[in-house]
């Protein structure tokens, strides 16, 4: 149980910094037959609109669920998840009888991990994870809920859709943001019902994704279509990591309590030291 909180940090590092450095390169799409382009553009606009129509607005969410982590050995825990849009993500680990053994809190500028088993905590600037990228709490919230986003632009919407390219073969739609961060690209895929199915992060030198999030159990809610199963895969150092987060029914826009307090009697640990436990 002592590794669960650490692994949560690592998973966030894997997902938030895999796009590489803050330097970006803009990809220009090739030109072609004007008539063909017009037809494709009309189809693409329709698919864009249908995908965007599935994305609602929300202010708060809270739910219970389960978390399974495999990083050489596997462990599972019940969880409580709470979010305030643009402000905070709170995950409480409760493996037995609803007793909290650890928690993770991400705010606009900081990340906190509390390990109640060993009475220690880590408190770091969120820049530890973002490495200079314009990634916000909202970006991570979108990632956890299965909502497509464009780094630096927010959730996909009518105003920013031109900053990505959408292709469709009738069964699968692929959304590729135009701005690529040096060394990596990231793409979203959707099924024919316009539900998100994956987020793939791929190094420029590779033909397959190095980091992948699979989304399933997508449900229509008051906040739009939300994936209730989130499964992330990737490699951290020499270790293969898999994390699966399953949500129960989500309560939206209610009163949510986010505990920002840090236990004064706990010892503070450098988060980089925790990360190094899994880097070899």
Feature roles, as predicted:
Residues 72-85, 89-98:
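Structural recognition of beta-strand segments within beta-rich domains
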Residues 47, 117-186, 264:
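Flexible, processing/modification-adjacent segments and terminal tails
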Residues 20-21, 156-268:
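Gly/Pro-enriched, hydrophobic low-complexity segments
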Residues 20-76, 271-280:
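N-terminal leader/targeting segments and the immediate start of mature chains
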Residues 75, 105-106, 207-212:
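Amphipathic hydrophobic-ligand
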Residues 23, 88-142:
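An acidic-aromatic
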Residues 1-8:
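Bacterial N-terminal signal peptides that target proteins for export
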Residues 15-18:
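C-terminal motif of bacterial Sec signal peptides marking the signal peptidase cleavage site
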